[in-house]
Amino acid sequence: MAKDTELDRKFFTALGQRIQTLRKRRGYSQEDMISFGYTVRYWQRIEAGKPITLRTLLRICGILGTTAEAVVRGLGPEAVKRPVRR
């Protein structure tokens, strides 16, 4: 069970980093996310690896103009064992 928890933590950390990269590529600041209904603090937590629901992921993907499939591609168990490159 602890192994699954560690993989979950690594997955959401990698997911948060990927969301942050996409946000920056689209030219949005964290403050810009307020207009989409997210507080800066909540957005910071997502990008820091806070677990999110599928519904939240889909909403974020809509905002960032991508798909959930594209965002999570490569974030399987093998990927989250390696450090994320920037």
State where each predicted segment sits.
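Short, charged recognition helix plus adjacent turn
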Residues: M1-K10, V72-R86
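A short, Lys/Arg-rich alpha-helix, primarily the initiator
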Residues: M1-R25
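DNA-binding alpha-helical recognition surfaces that contact promoter or target DNA
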Residues: Q17, T21, S35, R45, ...
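Helix-turn-helix DNA-binding elements, focusing on the entry/boundary residues of the two helices
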Residues: I19, S29-Q30, V40, L54-L57, ...
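Short alpha-helical DNA-recognition segment
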Residues: R25-Q44
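The DNA-recognition helices of helix-turn-helix-type DNA-binding domains
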Residues: V40, K50, L75-A79
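Short, basic-rich loop-to-helix N-cap that marks the start of a DNA-contacting helix
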Residues: G49-G62
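Intrinsically disordered, low-complexity basic tails/linkers immediately adjacent to helix-turn-helix/homeobox/MYB/SANT
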Residues: L64-V71
